[in-house]
Amino acid sequence: MNKRSFKLKIACVFLIVAMAGCTKLHEQVIDEVLGSSSASPQNALAAAYGQMDNGTFVNHAQAFALQEYSTNEAILPTRGSDWGDGGIYRAIHEFTWDGTNSMITNTWNSLNLGITESLTAINSVTQSNDPNKAQLLAEAKALLDLYTFHALDLFGQAPYRDPSTANAPLQVRKAATAIDSLITDVESLIPNLANIGQNNTGNGRFTKQAAYALLADMYLNRAVFKDRYASTFNFTEAAVDGNGTDMDKVITYTSQLIGSGQFKLESNFFHNFDIANANGTELIFVITQYVNTLTNSSNNFAYMPMERNQKPSPANRGTNASCITPEFYHTWDNNHNDPRFQRHYQYADGTWFMNDGTDVSVPVTTAVIGGTTLPWFHFNRGMQVGQQYGPSLSGSSDYQRTPDGRIKVNMLYCEKAPTQLMDFTPALNFDDPTQGVFTQLEINQGVRPFKFEFDPTGLNSRSNSAIPMYRLGGMYCMRAEAYLRKGQTTQALADVNALRTSRTREALYANAPGTALISIDMPTLYNETGYEMYWEMYRRKASIRFGTFEAAGTTKPVSQPFRRIYPIPQSTMDASKLFAQNDGY
């Protein structure tokens, strides 16, 4: 059974349930009373997994927004008549958010639903006689720890109810103390988790390898969790079990993955984010996605930065929303030959899409979209900067063609400002530098990261691309940071250079590998983690650890440490006396 088989099996269950008159298995499971044994263990576990792609980690306006738009990497400005929405997007980057921001509320609710569904799965599996009970129970508990970790990271606290006790009271876990309990729990689950690829598992299931990655993440951020508002963090504190320090544990767990032989760095960096990436050699734990099932999926990470007149097929377009900041773009200065910066697409007949004004046409390839065969235009990947080129529509179902039937490449203009060239400028020039608001004639601004491949079969909104939660490149970043915090500069440099030199450019540039560094320090490592992990919900935690989170930037003033976590939503505070509001809110 392949890596996605478990979720595919559950997708079939979804279909059967739908045909019987219930639209989603989620609805059935959510309605189960905690403590009931009526939910089948596999269905309950599927619901816990399913909450990951029910917006939580795949919608740009939930965890992604809080982890990315709050940093010096990404921004979603108001673009003329679009993306105002009461200022909810700008507030995250301008650090003016409060407990009424709907993205904060939705993220909190989604994580809490993940916690609830994990607790339901734990209870269901515990009461079952499933022959694979030990493994399923370990997976359910691991998902509970994963959702709780993210809630503690973003909000500093998380709800909990003991699933082993009938009518157990609702409790509140606090980050400073709960992080150690989470670490201990995940470590205790490892014996009962399957090795990846065994017992019908793959990278879409929580395996021993996913546990090692989560533990490395927990230990790397443990010092922050324990003293959130500190001016400096104690990264050398003794580990939970007393064996070594936090950074020693990061090295241990990442090394188990790096040295296992089960994973391999992709020479083409962007393969990690392709539509057909499910069997990627680098992927440790992913959110599996399908277009053609009743499970959820999202194309957001590709759709949001693409302009509305960039059309991967005549039936698709981008939405001209998010972009990277000038600060992040300029970290790439003198590093544009890095294979992770940009990659040109080559068509089967050898045509390269240069996107520089020299293109005349590209050959026609096809993608099946909505039961029809439509031409598919492949945009380049990575950072898209400067004047953009691509196809224009001829009618509603085809591109403009050259006399020999190829797709004509044109200079592009912004859809909602037809006289404005689609020039993705590195600079973001706002009339009021404290507010990210563009006029209608300024909506072109901002370099766009095309890290994830746009899936034209999903009609803009859905995708078959698996979303990496943990991958091997991230493990190298974590281990390099742990080495450097221990003063082991040689080892840190070796890990950074392993990432740099394993990635290669396209054949247009003779498949040249990235160049190695000759030295490393903390600012350099911070930039290197950005090159590797941009657009992957990594930046906020890294910025806090590296001490850059409070710095002023584009539309952002110098901020106070209380902004390192978000407020408990006002709707929750109004409805319950259980939670105490976080400091500063």
Segments the model singles out, each with a brief description of its role:
Residues 19-25, 111-112, 181, 273-333, ...:
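Long, intrinsically disordered, low-complexity segments
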Residues 334-471:
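Flexible, polar/acidic helix-loop-strand segments at domain edges
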